[in-house]
Amino acid sequence: MVQRADINNVLSEIRNLRTQMMQNQRIEQDQSVRGRIDGPRQVQETQEVPSFSDMLGKAVNNVHEVQSQASELRTAYEMGDPNVDITRVMIAAQKSSVSFEALTQVRNRVVRAYEDIMNMPI
C-alpha cells in the first residue's frame, strides 16, 4: 500500500506540473497576442553589422600593418639597432608571411565562390 501511495503522489505531482505548464502557455499566448495588438513594448536598437567588404578591408589593412612592422624591424636590425634582436625580426617576418598567406587563401576562396555563382544555371 505504501508503494501505491507513492505512485499516487507522483501522479498528482505530474498533474500539477502539467496544469502549471498549461497556465504558463496560456499566459505566454496572451502576452504574444497582446503584443501584436498593442505593438512592440520596447524599441530594439539595431546593431550595425559590418559588411563583407568592410571586414575584408580591415583584414587587408591588418596584413599591411604586420608587413610594415616586419619591414621596419628588419631595417632596424640591418642598421645595427641594439634594441632589435634577430628573434624579434624572425618572429615578425613569420607573422607577416602567415598573415599574407591567409589573406591569399581568403582571396582564392572568394574568387572560387564568385566563379561558382557565375557558372550556376539560371
UniProtKB/Swiss-Prot annotation:
Main location: other
Superkingdom field: Bacteria
Molecular function as annotated in GO: cytoskeletal motor activity; structural molecule activity
Disulfide bonds listed in the record: none
PANTHER family to which the protein is assigned, alphabetical: FLAGELLAR HOOK-BASAL BODY COMPLEX PROTEIN FLIE, PTHR34653
HAMAP family tied to this protein: FliE (MF_00724)
NCBIfam families (alphabetical): fliE
Record's protein name: Flagellar hook-basal body complex protein FliE
Gene giving rise to this polypeptide: fliE
